[in-house]
Amino acid sequence: MKQINIFDEAIEECCSNPITGFYRDGFCRTDELDRGLHVVCAKVTDEFLNFSKSRGNDLSTPRPEFNFPGLKEGDSWCLCAERWKEAYECGFAPKIYLNRTNKKALSVIDIDILKDFALDLI
């Protein structure tokens, strides 16, 4: 299945170090198996990581058993659309890359909100 970004173009790689995405292929790809809808490519901040941890999703602690180094400020990561939206509503949403964000994010988050947080709009 072809994956497209919010501009109806081929989705760009979000990050390969650390490797991200539901399928750990570097892209914010999704399908029916991805219940969390990991489609928003964000540049994480310490504030967001602390917020996510407070909500029960610790993304900063290394988990060697899953080959996960833990995220640090400045890393790019495919976030769950609902988690990003929750962070936005609470004032902790990180900036995002629209060319790397899956169009499926629009089923959860308004495009104008996403554009306000874009790092790659000219």
Positions of predicted regions on the chain:
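Residues that flank catalytic or metal-binding motifs in active/ligand-binding sites
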Residues: H38, E73, P94
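Short, compositionally biased
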Residues: W84-S107
